[in-house]
């Protein structure tokens, strides 16, 4: 029995050893290295055998259920969690067990952090899988870190002690100027060949871009004047309760911009009739038609089953499907009448396929990505539905081929030019040109245009892109075909761009007040003056200088605008009645605060204001109430997408202070739009290194005049030899005039970039400042950064999760006085479970008693500091 028990115990222990993790295998190897002399543990084996015999009879045929092994033999096995889970601040652990897990709460032990300032870990390894999926380069090379400007204190260390303070300040200012000049030149050389940079500053590209922008602006102006002449603006008010009429007007403007005719505008009336002709039992689909750019009634019936599947997934689509949630009412009735609705759908699709050709394919493409995921339990139903959908698709296609024959001599059907399908590309590398994307997407039918956003310096000048297609295409099929295509080692990874959910959005209803409306008329007129002059929209010729602001504008909507800016007062009546000062209250003060007034609405002023705001929105793509300009809107999928209007009337009375505060805040927001594009003065440009074209040409000629020997000179551009340098110079100007022109254009290219006060640049990296005496910051947060829950993901150090929000984690508040070390022992590098203990309240404030079970470092240095002593911080 002894030998069999030996084997029994060994097998039991080996079984549990095999289930242990790598953390315990080193101990297993150590034990086996010492040999399998189990007689040394006879005391333990005997004790366990006796304990089994005392409590029950031993039976070999009976399956034993063993409790976990004893603690002195191995760590307890009932929990798959290590000791540092409970004691995350234990300094004895090496910190290298889980390098992929993050330790929160503060600085960590372990390998040193990457180069550079801790605020600049952009696109680090922990976000690579996500970024690679979204279309960025698979392996991102951060390259050489950009140089950081020295602080004045660091600069003083490089100077001799004999330099006095005035000279040191002067030298430091010269150093800063040289540093910025060098940074600017390096940036120019790094990006001069990229399309976005050349289109902004190169003289040839700038001219083309201005001409295209001017042509698009004049087209929008013609559309606005056409709509105004046909009476589209006569009874239109920019109030939230007129949202349907506003959307209809925006759609009409888009149809006109796309080259549509009055006949094409009839489709807006047809859509409205179809919406009103819906069944009374069904929920109203007018709002849905607004939000999704007006889907037809026949389209909805055709895809009735798709809507039923979508109802179960509405919770995932918060922002895009607000209006569709109404469909969930009466799902039971829809399910009971499923077969009838399918038959009606087929009939309606046959009747309306001439008006809505290709709508079925759009419906499949316009649903959100989350709705495209299929469930395994519905495989058979989906297969049947797919077959039916294919049959329904084939019928419209057959009739589409017959349609041109029938309509050859008949009236043309109105085209839905205001509806489009589009793809969104999140990350487009700066070295990819628009022409490359256009040539790639032109292969697919229905392609219309490409829009690219401005490059983002914080994302390595990557851009976002939108590719617009005709409404009749199957956008999901095109998206799938483009999914794995790479351009210049960059994955495009397109996604289907959803339709706008709320095209009309409202702001505070206080904007209906008469005083605010009059102020808005003044600001809107000033904006129109500024934008018209900047774009030279009303100039007779492109070369004509803009009209001075003192002269009346040729813009017809500004005619007699001053009549509405003059406020009429009853001064004589007040004098006769004996009013000493200020206008008398229009009505006796009611109960409550007498300083409060009712919102007074003047319909005449509002009508004048709305015409100005529509001019800004349609012609200049400026949303007045949102105080922003929509750039490149002509290239976007929606050429007139969103507009902000006045909200409902405030239910309560308003104070005079609220009116003044609103006006002041609104004018501050509009200031950037009113300001003229800034450029450097001549003096500042010279300091920054402005280049002279003549000097640069001389440098070019000198560098291409090489002396080979006595009376022997070479022109390296052509390889010809001459007897003197003057002959080489004459040869270059005569035979290489295009090279001279290139030099002059390059100088103008650089000077255009230099004189732009808002020129793009790398994000400035500021050295870390020591915390001030009253500065309290969460761990891992540096001055100038937002709080952890607002910090961009790319700005977090490598391998660490976001630090706890202020007041909720370990060391959430640092001591006000800087000490020699951290307030608490640091969490080890890669603390398990994301340092969950930090969120359980261990150490919410300095001085809180620590958990007695947590082992502290016995070698911790006891430090004494005079709290009354001034901080050892130098200020310059």
UniProtKB/Swiss-Prot annotation:
GO BP term, pick one: positive regulation of neurogenesis
Modified residues (Omega-N-methylarginine): 833, 840, 850
GO function terms (MF aspect): DNA binding; mRNA cap binding complex binding; protein-macromolecule adaptor activity; RNA binding
Complexes and interactors: Interacts with NCBP1 and DROSHA. Interacts with CASP8AP2 and ERBB4. Interacts with LUZP4. Interacts with NCBP2/CBP20 and NCBP3. Interacts with MTREX.
Tissues/organs with expression: Ubiquitously expressed.
Record-listed Phosphoserine modification sites: 4, 67, 74, 136, 493, 540, 570, 679
Family: Belongs to the ARS2 family.
Residues recorded with modification Phosphothreonine: 544, 671
Pfam families with a match to the protein in the record: ARS2, SERRATE_Ars2_N
Keyword Cytoplasm listed: yes
Organism name: Homo sapiens
SUPFAM superfamilies with a match to the protein in the record: RNA-binding domain, RBD (SSF54928)
InterPro entries assigned to the protein according to its UniProt record, in alphabetical order: RBD_domain_sf (IPR035979), SE/Ars2 (IPR039727), SERRATE/Ars2_C (IPR007042), SERRATE/Ars2_N (IPR021933)
Location relative to the cell: Nucleus, Nucleoplasm; Cytoplasm
PANTHER family for this protein: ARSENITE-RESISTANCE PROTEIN 2 (PTHR13165), SERRATE RNA EFFECTOR MOLECULE HOMOLOG (PTHR13165:SF0)
GO CC annotations, alphabetized: cytoplasm; nuclear body; nucleoplasm; protein-containing complex; ribonucleoprotein complex
Region entry Disordered, spans: 1-90, 271-412, 575-598, 835-854
Name of the protein in question: Serrate RNA effector molecule homolog
């Amino acid at each position: 029995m002894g030998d069999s028990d030996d084997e029994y115990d060994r097998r039991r222990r080996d079984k549990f050893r095999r289930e242990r993790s790598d953390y315990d295998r080193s101990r297993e190897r150590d034990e086996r290295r010492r040999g399998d002399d189990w007689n040394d543990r006879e005391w333990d084996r005997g004790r366990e055998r006796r304990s089994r015999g005392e409590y029950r009879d031993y039976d070999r045929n009976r399956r034993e259920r063993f409790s976990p092994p004893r603690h002195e033999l191995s760590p307890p096995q009932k929990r798959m969690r290590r000791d540092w889970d409970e004691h995350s601040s234990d300094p004895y652990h090496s910190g290298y067990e889980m390098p992929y897990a993050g330790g929160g709460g503060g600085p960590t032990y372990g390998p040193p952090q990457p180069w550079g300032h801790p605020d600049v870990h952009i696109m680090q390894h922990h976000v690579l899988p996500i970024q690679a999926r979204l279309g960025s380069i698979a392996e991102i090379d951060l390259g050489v870190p950009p140089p950081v400007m020295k602080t004045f204190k660091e600069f003083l260390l490089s100077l001799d002690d004999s330099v006095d303070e005035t000279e040191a300040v002067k030298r430091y200012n010269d150093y800063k100027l040289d540093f910025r000049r060098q940074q600017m030149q390096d940036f120019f050389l790094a990006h001069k060949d990229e399309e976005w940079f050349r289109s902004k500053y190169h003289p040839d590209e700038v001219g083309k871009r201005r001409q295209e922008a001017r042509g698009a602006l004049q087209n929008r102006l013609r559309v606005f004047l056409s709509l105004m002449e046909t009476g589209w603006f006569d009874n239109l008010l920019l109030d939230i309760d007129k949202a349907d009429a506003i959307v209809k007007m925006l759609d009409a403007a888009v149809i006109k911009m796309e080259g549509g005719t009055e006949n094409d505008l009839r489709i807006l009336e047809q859509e409205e009739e179809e919406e009103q002709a819906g069944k009374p039992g069904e929920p109203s689909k007018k709002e849905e038609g607004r939000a999704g750019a007006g889907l037809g009634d026949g389209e909805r019936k055709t895809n009735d089953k798709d809507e039923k599947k979508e109802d179960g997934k509405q919770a995932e689509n918060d922002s895009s499907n607000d209006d569709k949630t109404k469909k969930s009412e009466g799902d039971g009735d829809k399910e009971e009448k499923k077969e009838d609705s399918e038959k009606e759908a087929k009939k309606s699709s046959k009747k309306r396929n001439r008006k809505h050709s290709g709508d079925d394919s759009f419906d499949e493409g316009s649903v959100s990505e989350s709705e495209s995921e299929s469930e395994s339990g519905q495989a058979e139903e989906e297969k049947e539905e797919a077959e039916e959908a294919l049959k329904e698709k084939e019928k419209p296609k057959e009739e589409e081929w017959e349609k041109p024959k029938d309509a050859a001599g008949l009236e043309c059907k109105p085209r839905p030019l205001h509806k489009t399908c589009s793809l969104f590309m999140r990350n487009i590398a700066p070295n990819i040109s628009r022409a490359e994307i256009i040539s790639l997407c032109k292969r697919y039918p229905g392609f219309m245009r490409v829009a690219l956003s401005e490059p983002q310096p914080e994302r390595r000048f990557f851009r976002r892109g939108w590719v617009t297609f005709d409404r009749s295409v199957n956008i999901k099929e095109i998206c799938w075909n483009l999914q794995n295509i790479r351009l210049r080692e960059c994955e495009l990874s397109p996604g289907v761009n959803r339709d706008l959910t709320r095209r009309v959005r409202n702001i505070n209803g206080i904007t209906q007040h008469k005083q605010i409306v009059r102020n808005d008329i003044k600001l809107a007129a000033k904006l129109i003056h500024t934008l018209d002059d900047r774009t030279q929209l009303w100039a007779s010729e492109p070369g004509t200088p803009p009209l001075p602001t003192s002269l009346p504008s040729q813009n017809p909507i500004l005619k007699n605008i001053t009549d509405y800016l003059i406020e009429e007062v009853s001064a004589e009546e007040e004098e006769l009645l004996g009013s000493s000062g200020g206008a008398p209250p229009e009505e006796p003060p009611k109960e409550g605060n007498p300083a409060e007034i009712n919102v007074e609405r003047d319909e005449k002023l509002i009508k004048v204001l709305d015409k100005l705001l529509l001019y800004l929105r349609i012609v200049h793509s400026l949303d007045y109430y949102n105080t922003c300009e929509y750039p490149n809107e002509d290239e976007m999928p929606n050429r007139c997408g969103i507009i902000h209007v006045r909200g409902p009337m405030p239910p309560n009375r308003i104070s005079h202070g609220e009116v003044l505060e609103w006006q002041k805040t609104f004018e501050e927001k509009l200031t950037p739009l009113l300001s003229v594009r800034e450029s450097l003065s001549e003096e500042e440009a010279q300091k920054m290194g402005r280049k002279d074209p003549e000097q640069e040409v001389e440098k070019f000629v000198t560098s291409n005049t090489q002396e080979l020997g006595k009376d022997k000179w070479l022109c390296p551009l052509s390889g010809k030899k001459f007897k003197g340098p003057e002959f080489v110079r004459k040869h270059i100007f005569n035979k290489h005039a295009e090279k001279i022109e290139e030099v002059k254009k390059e100088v103008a290219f650089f000077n255009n970039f230099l004189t732009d006060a808002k020129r793009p640049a790398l994000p400035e990296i500021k050295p870390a400042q020591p915390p001030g005496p009253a500065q309290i910051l969460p761990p891992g947060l540096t001055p100038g950064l937002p709080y952890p829950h607002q910090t961009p993901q790319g700005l977090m150090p490598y391998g660490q999760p976001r630090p706890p929000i202020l007041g909720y984690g370990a060391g959430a508040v640092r001591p006000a006085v800087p000490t020699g070390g951290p307030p608490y022992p640091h969490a080890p590098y890669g603390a398990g479970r994301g340092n969950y203990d930090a969120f359980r309240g261990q150490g919410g404030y300095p001085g809180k008693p620590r958990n007695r079970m947590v082992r502290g470092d016995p070698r911790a240095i006891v430090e004494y500091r005079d709290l009354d002593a001034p901080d050892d911080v130098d200020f310059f």
